[in-house]
């Protein structure tokens, strides 16, 4: 009886071409591992983005270049651990580019503050002014809501549920964009600064909202600054987010097809006027949604590269 002691780290081969991506965007890699892995995925600083074994025998890992990560700190590493606990680490080569974001000024009127008093009191019951409540919600509640999105992001299918370009709200005009650097003013005084993390789309009031792609509803309830919020999982960490809805017309666990109506636009949460705040999440991190509305971007950045890697076997 002889016991084989495994001390060899797993061998990993990346099969996809070197991805080009800009700050705030997403890319994907496909790779093979020489033995069964107990964990594998991309490590970026403190963040870990898991990979999923596909029917073609390759692991697919989608990961973001987060908006708040400086280009010099964007050094993704492929971390793989085998069943015996041996680890291999490989630097993932990426062509990372910068992106310029707009600066935007929002005037927060007393009318707006008064119209939202009930919402504010529910989120921050303390005995303070509506303005103080607003600033606290825009900071503390926002941070707490973003942590919830990271938790929701863990609830993802191990296979791709979506296909093709994502569908935008029909007949909608683009308002605020992803990455807008916002300065909040009240009566001529600066009260706050935040970054806008989605794409605001405005159509008519209470416009029906289509599911942007096929997937499964993983969240459908009010959440802080977002108001009535629906999150659809599309697999491999990719999710779409729909917020400020006046009405949610779906529920958790529902399977949706691209174009299925999931609710109506509205002004819930911190919204001023009736609109849809549309977001894309990658493992719970908010990324550039416009990429996913663009069939050429999806083909060049994601699907062609994954298809070529699968065909190479």
PLM features: residue spans?
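Outer-membrane beta-barrel proteins
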Residues: 19, 64-66, 189
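Non-catalytic extracellular/periplasmic "stalk"
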Residues: 26-33, 39-177
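Short beta-strand/loop motifs in extracellular/secreted proteins, especially
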Residues: 10, 36-40, 228
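Proline-enriched interdomain boundary motifs that mark the N-terminal boundary
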Residues: 9-15, 209
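Short beta-strand segments of immunoglobulin-like
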Residues: 16-22
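Proline/serine/threonine-rich low-complexity linkers at boundaries of modular beta-sandwich domains
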Residues: 1-11
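Catalytic cores of peptidoglycan-degrading enzymes
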Residues: 165-312
């Amino acid at each position: 009886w002889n016991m084989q002691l495994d001390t060899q780290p797993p061998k990993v081969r990346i099969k996809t071409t070197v991805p080009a991506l800009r700050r705030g965007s997403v890319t994907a890699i496909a790779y093979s591992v020489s033995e069964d892995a107990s964990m594998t995925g991309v490590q970026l600083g403190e963040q870990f983005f898991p990979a999923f074994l596909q029917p073609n025998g390759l692991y697919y890992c989608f990961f973001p270049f987060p908006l708040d990560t400086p280009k010099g700190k964007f050094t993704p590493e492929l971390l793989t651990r085998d069943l015996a606990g041996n680890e291999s680490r490989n630097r993932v080569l990426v062509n990372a580019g910068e992106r310029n974001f707009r600066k935007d000024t929002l005037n927060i009127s007393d009318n707006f503050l008064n119209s939202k008093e009930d919402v504010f009191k529910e989120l921050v019951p303390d005995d303070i002014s509506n303005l103080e409540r607003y600033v606290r919600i825009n900071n503390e509640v926002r941070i707490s809501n973003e942590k919830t999105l990271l938790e929701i992001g863990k609830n993802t299918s191990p296979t791709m549920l979506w296909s093709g370009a994502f569908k935008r709200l029909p007949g909608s005009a683009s308002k605020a964009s992803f990455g807008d650097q916002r300065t909040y003013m009240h009566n001529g005084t600066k009260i706050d600064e935040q970054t806008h993390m989605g794409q605001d789309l405005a159509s008519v009031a209470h416009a029906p909202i289509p599911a942007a792609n096929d997937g499964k509803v993983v969240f459908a309830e009010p959440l802080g600054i977002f108001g009535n919020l629906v999150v659809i999982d599309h697999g491999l960490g990719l999710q779409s987010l729909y917020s400020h809805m006046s009405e949610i017309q779906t529920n958790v666990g529902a399977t949706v097809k691209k174009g299925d109506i999931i609710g109506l636009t509205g002004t819930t949460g911190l919204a001023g006027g009736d609109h849809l705040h549309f977001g894309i999440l990658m493992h719970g991190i908010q990324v550039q949604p416009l990429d996913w509305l663009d069939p050429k971007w999806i083909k060049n950045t994601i699907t062609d590269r994954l298809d070529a890697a699968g065909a190479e076997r």
